[in-house]
Amino acid sequence: MAGGVLFFVIMLPGPASDLGRYMDLLSARQKLVASNIANADTPGYQTQDIDFQFEFVTMANGQQPQTIRPRGLKQTPDGNNVDLDREARLLAEDAIRFNVASSLLRGQIKVVQEAIQGGGNA
């Protein structure tokens, strides 16, 4: 998001602010997934992720989410546990989530802009 839009989102109450935080978490997860993919052949590398439910409830605006190491992933003999199929699935799912959230946020911003410009008068 552009700096002005991010500031605008932070200043919005309730759902818009929550959408902004949710999108921040999705962005952070995308970076982790990209790192996981980049390290798929690195001996000893352990997959990292974000616990969305915990982080969404506890994360303050602007604070970086804590990473977790997902359990139950198959480890290779060199100690690496990156599952490229899992990472590709996460990228696709999160892209869809981000698109939905950004559409909802655009709608909320449009309502506020119309109210500010006087277009919301009945």
Predicted segments — roles?
Residues 2-122:
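Amphipathic alpha-helical polymerization modules
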